[in-house]
């Protein structure tokens, strides 16, 4: 029998806040924050090298029924498909957008897998979106 990688949950506010300081990966269906844990953090949390995931669905997405449906769809997509792409000793926080409710399940799993495996991708090759002016004399002085 094939052993599945156990994916643990983020439950405490402090855990969510530390992941928030990590790398952000934006997509049309959700925003994903990713942070690698140090060995000390993994030992302190007694999680080993298992990946952990937390879900956030804000009230602007709808009432409790809609928010829970979005959360359940994301959990199932992680459990069935995208969980195998998760790196060990890494925490993920998924902030759902309203479009995650009506998107086809195949698109949801594909988008999750793409965002999980993307490491440090930037649109413009690492350059800033807006260029800063060169430092120089002020008012011709």
UniProtKB/Swiss-Prot annotation:
<feature type="compositionally biased region" description="Basic and acidic residues">
    <location>
        <begin position="114"/>
        <end position="124"/>
    </location>
</feature>
<keyword id="KW-0540">Nuclease</keyword>
<comment type="function">
    <text>RNaseP catalyzes the removal of the 5'-leader sequence from pre-tRNA to produce the mature 5'-terminus. It can also cleave other RNA substrates such as 4.5S RNA. The protein component plays an auxiliary but essential role in vivo by binding to the 5'-leader sequence and broadening the substrate specificity of the ribozyme.</text>
</comment>
<dbReference type="GO" id="GO:0000049">
    <property type="term" value="F:tRNA binding"/>
</dbReference>
<comment type="similarity">
    <text>Belongs to the RnpA family.</text>
</comment>
<keyword id="KW-0694">RNA-binding</keyword>
<dbReference type="GO" id="GO:0030677">
    <property type="term" value="C:ribonuclease P complex"/>
</dbReference>
<protein>
    <recommendedName>
        <fullName>Ribonuclease P protein component</fullName>
        <ecNumber>3.1.26.5</ecNumber>
    </recommendedName>
</protein>
<keyword id="KW-0378">Hydrolase</keyword>
<feature type="region of interest" description="Disordered">
    <location>
        <begin position="37"/>
        <end position="56"/>
    </location>
</feature>
<keyword id="KW-0255">Endonuclease</keyword>
<dbReference type="GO" id="GO:0004526">
    <property type="term" value="F:ribonuclease P activity"/>
</dbReference>
<keyword id="KW-0819">tRNA processing</keyword>
<dbReference type="InterPro" id="IPR020539">
    <property type="entry name" value="RNase_P_CS"/>
</dbReference>
<dbReference type="InterPro" id="IPR014721">
    <property type="entry name" value="Ribsml_uS5_D2-typ_fold_subgr"/>
</dbReference>
<dbReference type="InterPro" id="IPR020568">
    <property type="entry name" value="Ribosomal_Su5_D2-typ_SF"/>
</dbReference>
<dbReference type="GO" id="GO:0001682">
    <property type="term" value="P:tRNA 5'-leader removal"/>
</dbReference>
<comment type="subunit">
    <text>Consists of a catalytic RNA component (M1 or rnpB) and a protein subunit.</text>
</comment>
<dbReference type="InterPro" id="IPR000100">
    <property type="entry name" value="RNase_P"/>
</dbReference>
<dbReference type="GO" id="GO:0042781">
    <property type="term" value="F:3'-tRNA processing endoribonuclease activity"/>
</dbReference>
<dbReference type="Pfam" id="PF00825">
    <property type="entry name" value="Ribonuclease_P"/>
</dbReference>
<feature type="region of interest" description="Disordered">
    <location>
        <begin position="114"/>
        <end position="141"/>
    </location>
</feature>
